[in-house]
């Protein structure tokens, strides 16, 4: 195993790039399940007679629980680290998906997706993204861009595979296949999650940081939260309704998921480009340009 030690001066630790791979994969799986809701939407609505709005609320449920618990897990990570976040997320994601394969009510549908968001997506995304950032001094934008691209790529690949599974064997088998695959892929690599030595030092012996930015940290968080909230709202609504909209227009499920795949692959490439651009011109100018 690559030692998670501080590298030579002028280079980022090699283990940091392994962390990029780990979190890329975990976030790809977790966000992929969000995107897959758009593929499950019509089969579940037909199976149980649910309305389109009721079924799509599953996406809202998982997004809400992810946001709510993401704040809490961020606090926990700052206090005690995120060493075991990946393991808990892997087990929760697999369990939730397996239970969804045998759901019989709308309440169960919401409950299991809430669980997926609270202890799966919320633990596999934001706190581990922050973990990755602490590993890098020289290429943080590129590292985080590659890491974040996992969520976009996962939202393209997972729905595409789920669409094929539903077409071949039905929605229940598709959920079961996801559960087994998530456990096999996510659990082994989750044990590779480590804290960077720099973050451990900062957490155990915090130092007063000299600030030159005109706004306080709290003000920055508030404004960035509003920006991200409106950005993600505008992005997520088309994602969850794209596949049903295309199949309603008499397009095949394979075609619909292919369109989503192309869209999200482009999104992944954009995140990598934006991350590298941030290393060159700075984070704020890049955010303005990409917006």
Indicate where each model-derived feature is located.
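Helix-loop-helix hairpin linking two adjacent transmembrane segments in secondary transporters
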Residues: 146-197
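Extracytoplasmic
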Residues: 15-52, 69-73, 158-159, 235-243
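C-terminal ends and interior cores of transmembrane alpha-helices
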Residues: 91-104
């Amino acid at each position: 195993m690559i030692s998670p030690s501080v590298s030579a001066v002028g280079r980022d630790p090699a283990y940091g790039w392994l962390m990029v791979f780990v979190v890329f994969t975990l976030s790809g799986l977790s966000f992929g399940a969000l995107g897959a809701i758009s593929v499950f939407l019509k089969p579940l609505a037909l199976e149980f007679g649910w309305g389109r709005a009721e079924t799509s609320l599953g996406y809202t449920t998982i997004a809400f629980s992810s946001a709510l618990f993401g704040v809490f897990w961020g606090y926990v990570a700052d206090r005690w680290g995120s060493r075991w976040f990946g393991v808990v997320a892997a087990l929760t994601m697999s369990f939730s998906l397996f239970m969804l394969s045998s759901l019989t009510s709308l309440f169960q549908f919401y409950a299991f997706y809430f669980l997926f968001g609270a202890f799966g997506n919320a633990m596999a995304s934001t706190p581990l993204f922050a973990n990755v950032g602490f590993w890098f001094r020289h290429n943080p934008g590129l590292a985080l861009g590659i890491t974040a691209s996992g969520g976009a790529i996962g939202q393209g690949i997972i729905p595409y595979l789920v669409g094929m599974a539903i077409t071949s064997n039905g929605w229940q088998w598709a959920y079961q296949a996801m559960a087994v695959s998530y456990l096999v892929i996510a659990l082994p690599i989750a044990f590779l999650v480590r804290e960077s030595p720099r973050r451990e030092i900062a957490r155990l012996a915090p130092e007063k940081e000299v600030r030159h930015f005109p706004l306080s940290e709290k003000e920055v968080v508030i404004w960035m939260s509003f920006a991200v909230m409106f950005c993600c709202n505008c992005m997520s609504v088309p994602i969850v309704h794209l596949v049903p909209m295309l199949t309603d227009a008499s397009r095949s499920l394979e075609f619909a998921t292919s369109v989503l795949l192309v869209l999200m692959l482009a999104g992944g490439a954009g995140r990598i480009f934006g991350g590298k651009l941030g290393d060159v011109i700075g984070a704020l100018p890049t955010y303005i340009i990409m917006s």
